[in-house]
Swiss-Prot record:
InterPro entries: PLipase_D/transphosphatidylase, PP_kinase, PP_kinase_C_1, PP_kinase_middle, PP_kinase_middle_dom_sf, PPK_C_dom2, PPK_N_dom, PPK_N_dom_sf. The keyword Acetylation does not apply. It comes from Klebsiella pneumoniae. Belongs to the polyphosphate kinase 1 (PPK1) family. ATP binds at N45, Y465, R561, H589. Gene3D superfamilies: Endonuclease Chain A (3.30.870.10), Polyphosphate kinase middle domain (3.30.1840.10), Polyphosphate kinase N-terminal domain (1.20.58.310). Residues 427-461, 584-614 form the PLD phosphodiesterase domain. This is Polyphosphate kinase. The gene is ppk. The keyword Transferase applies. One of its GO terms (biological process) is polyphosphate biosynthetic process. Its cofactor is Mg(2+). Pfam families: PP_kinase, PP_kinase_C, PP_kinase_C_1, PP_kinase_N.
Length: 685
């Protein structure tokens, strides 16, 4: 069988994932405003795809052509364009459908041509007092370097100022980072109507207010556009430059190459050609004629308006009642390991533990690594307070966290100014593990408390991402977490681990060993099986090992949210592999590895997907669940996920996103069922 038939291209698999998001926008069982928000999620995901996946593909094509090689990537580029175009057409149809449905619910997203006289007067006042100060037209002339000053993925209005035969072209940035994208208008009769207007359309309506008195014109026309840049920064540098200086420098220079140009499809041809030329759009780039509005990612924040049933019914965060039995978090964790599962559990327990550590006289030291933290991070505040209280605080800051580089540079400087010892990863070795280690003097001993997680220390994402936190004082684990921090500080010194899987040290070898053990058990007639929950499965070495397991009779069950290169149910190769994906109100983000081990199941929670970069080129940590209670909880949750009959889709060779048929099984929406399961665990004794 040819190699191309054994693996799905990861870029196409990623687009199929985003099409599952679009399915949620189309799903009429979802509340109306949530469907509109899924359109925003789809758009945001697609922007990231072009910044990262498409940009990487473009670089591969250019390198291949420079070397005179026949590039498969060129053919893949055509497949991508075709798939995106089809999905975008579905997107446009869904958006129009949802607008009609919103109107039936008395919510009206109107444009500048639909304003009443009262609303027109109100908008001019709004523009004058709240918006005008953020608007500065940029006139395009022969010397204008659009690539230099256009912001990545910002929407602009390209304006035609027509005077006789003469046309001038200014650009207006839509300042949605300073003014709300959705503006509520004064209601008209009947009062129950809730009219809103997009910021884009306010600018369209107020073009006269912007240009009158500065230009003579016969007509003003405005068309929307945006440009997406390659997200990889060029860090070619002198050897003595620090990583923070490099990242700061690269972020100040908006010179990453464009990879996508999106424009309003009725934009005049002359304007399109002028903008393409100014943006140096090449034949490798994506050129997308789109609708009137771009940056639908703002629709993620579509406001709660109208009836309560237009949004999801709230699921209050659950407290882990074990903490309520003790005077502080340390006593609770020392008594037994604690497993938290977000967003079902509240993230407050982790925040409170770090707050307590910041002033507890018994705490000697805190070490933590941050990858993406919230804008107003209480974790950062706790580390600063701990330093002020003379604790020895070490914060490992990952400066190369894509899209969070600027924020992490800010935090690194703020922490350093507060006296925190800040260290960075070695260039080319990102730290993606989710760890902290608290050292506490208890009698004559120093007891260590560790956190190992699957998600970031981020108050905001803990509300929408499913992730685990394991809190433990078990010395078998805490001693090895201590070694991980030593490895981070000295990445080229030898280090060994007995319990943790640590990339790039031992993860690949141990994962291969555990898969091979399942193969051996199956061949001996013993119980065998592999169950994985991942965001992405694209490492060919691991995919091939799973194929080998399937061929040997090992049942393999996979729950993959995003990219999956593995093709299930290939005769003689993957007959025993089943792959599903779940997209619902929460983003499935945790990673779980389960190996049957002849009935004595090994269960790991991990920060690492099965991608080459996570296994070989990042610092990642997977921890075994040593407490039988916690192991069983994860097994129960995994069983619920695989029993989903509402939001589960099959991953198949055709990338069809077929829903798993319910048949005669009971209706199970796994995320709601998991909430009920966690709630049952947290009942008072």
């Amino acid at each position: 069988m040819g190699q191309e038939k054994l693996y799905i291209e990861k870029e196409l698999s990623w687009l199929a994932f985003n099409e599952r998001v679009l399915q949620e926008a189309a799903d009429k069982s979802n509340p109306l405003i949530e469907r509109m928000r899924f359109l925003g999620i789809y758009s945001n995901n697609l922007d990231e795809f072009y910044k990262v996946r498409f940009a990487e593909l473009k670089r591969r094509i250019i390198i291949s052509e420079e070397q005179g090689l026949n590039s498969h990537s060129r053919h893949l580029l055509g497949k991508i364009q075709s798939r995106v175009l089809k999905a975008d057409q579905e997107f446009d149809g869904l958006y129009n459908e949802l607008l009609l449905e919103m109107a039936r619910n008395q919510i009206f997203l109107i444009n500048e041509r639909q304003l009443s006289v009262n609303q027109q007067n109100w908008l001019r006042h709004y523009f004058k007092h709240y918006l005008r100060q953020h608007i500065t037209p940029i006139l395009i002339n022969r010397e204008t370097d659009l690539v230099q000053f256009l912001k990545d993925d910002y929407t602009y209005l390209a304006v035609e100022i027509i005077r006789g035969e003469s046309i001038r072209y200014p650009l207006l940035e839509i300042p949605s980072d300073k003014v709300p994208r959705f503006v509520n208008l004064p209601p008209e009769t009947p009062r129950r109507r809730k009219p809103m207007i997009l910021l884009d359309n306010i600018l369209r309506y107020c073009l006269d207010d912007i240009f009158k008195g500065f230009f003579d014109y016969d007509a003003l026309n405005a068309y929307s556009m945006k440009m997406t840049r390659d997200a990889e920064y060029d860090l070619v540098h002198e050897m003595e430059a620090s990583l923070m200086e490099l990242m700061s420098s690269s972020l100040k220079q908006p010179d990453a190459e464009p990879v996508r140009f999106v424009y309003q499809r009725d934009m005049p041809d002359a304007m399109v050609e002028m903008l393409r030329d100014k943006l140096t759009i090449s034949r490798y780039d994506s050129i997308v004629p789109g609708g009137r509005y771009h940056n639908f990612k703002d629709f993620i924040g579509f406001p709660n308006v109208g009836k309560a049933n237009l949004v999801n019914k709230p699921l209050p965060r659950l407290r882990h009642l074990w903490f309520d039995k003790f005077r502080n978090g340390f006593d609770a964790i020392r008594e037994r390991d604690v497993l938290l599962y977000y967003p079902y559990h509240t993230f407050e327990h982790v925040l409170e533990l770090l707050r307590q550590a910041s002033f507890d006289p018994s705490v000697l030291a805190i070490k933590i690594n941050i990858y993406r933290v919230a804008k107003d991070s209480r974790i950062i505040d706790a580390m600063i307070h701990a330093a002020h209280n003379a604790k020895k605080v070490t914060v490992v800051v990952e400066l190369q966290a894509r899209f969070d580089e600027e924020a992490n540079i800010h935090w690194a400087r703020r922490l350093t100014e507060a006296g925190v010892h800040v260290i960075f990863s070695a260039p080319g070795l990102k730290i993606h593990a989710k760890l902290f280690l608290i050292s506490r003097k208890e009698g004559d001993d120093v007891v260590r408390y560790a956190h190992i997680g699957t998600g970031n220390f981020n108050e905001k994402t803990s509300l929408i991402y499913t992730d685990y936190s394991l809190l433990t004082a078990d010395a078998r684990i805490t001693n090895e977490v201590r070694r991980v921090f030593n490895f981070i500080e000295n990445p080229y010194r030898p280090v060994s681990f007995d319990y943790l899987l640590v990339s790039p040290q031992n993860s690949r070898r141990l994962l291969y060993d555990m898969i091979d053990k399942e193969i051996a058990n199956a061949q001996k007639g013993l119980s065998s099986g592999i169950t994985l929950k991942l965001n992405n499965l694209v490492d060919k070495g691991l995919v091939d090992r799973l194929y080998a397991a399937s061929s040997s009779g090992v049942p393999v069950n996979l729950l993959i949210r995003g990219m999956c290169s593995l093709i299930p149910e290939l005769e003689g190769i993957s007959d025993n592999i089943r792959v599903i994906s779940i997209v619902d109100r929460y983003l499935e983000h945790d990673r779980i590895y389960i190996f049957d081990n002849a009935g004595d199941k090994q269960v790991y929670l991990s920060s690492a997907d099965w991608m080459t970069r996570n296994i070989d080129y990042r610092i990642e940590v997977a921890a075994p669940l040593l407490d039988p209670r916690l192991k069983q909880q994860i097994l129960d949750i995994i069983e619920i996920l695989f029993s989903d009959t509402v939001k589960a889709r099959y991953i198949d060779k055709e990338l069809s996103n077929r829903y798993v048929p319910r048949g005669n099984r009971r209706k199970v929406r796994s995320q709601l069922a998991i909430y009920d399961y966690i709630k049952s665990l947290e009942q008072p004794d």
